[in-house]
Amino acid sequence: MQIAIVDDRAEDREELSACLENYMKKHQLDYTLTEFEDGENFLKAAAQVDFQLVFMDIYMENMDGIEAARRLRQKNRLCKIVFLTITEDYARMGYSLSASYYLLKPLSLHQADFEEAMELCQLKPVSYTHLRAHETAANL
């Protein structure tokens, strides 16, 4: 699973990275994590890498997380987005971009919410059998 953290604060990236590492070890899930300080660099990378899960801070300089998510959605409709912020002010706007979840910082105070977000966003591999059944149904 390709995961990105997009947050301009190194402390917040470190905290989320530790939460992800603990969660993935606990559930024995493989993942690759890439961290970005801003939306522009993230979008450049997202043009080359198919991220399945993105944790996006809303308040960032130059390009906020809402704009970065809007641009990501133009190219990747299936990516799960979890917004990160210190306030719920932009929650409605985030969900208009098909956000999967909305986490408040600091994560240390909202660990149960992080666990819930991961459960909702966890991507399961699609089996070959499922694809074959889907292809057969499409041909009917």
Outline where the language-model segments fall:
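Cytosolic catalytic cores of cyclic-nucleotide second-messenger enzymes
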Residues: 140
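Two-component/phosphorelay signaling modules centered on CheY-like receiver
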Residues: 10-34
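Residue-level signal for the "D+5" position in two-component response regulator receiver
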Residues: 35, 62-63, 137
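CheY-like receiver
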Residues: 44-45, 51-126
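Conserved small/polar residues in nucleotide/adenosyl-binding loops
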Residues: 129-136
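Short alpha-helical segment
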Residues: 40-42
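Conserved sequence signature across two-component system core domains
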Residues: 6-7, 36, 54
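Non-catalytic signal-transmission and effector/linker regions of two-component phosphorelay proteins
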Residues: 1-4
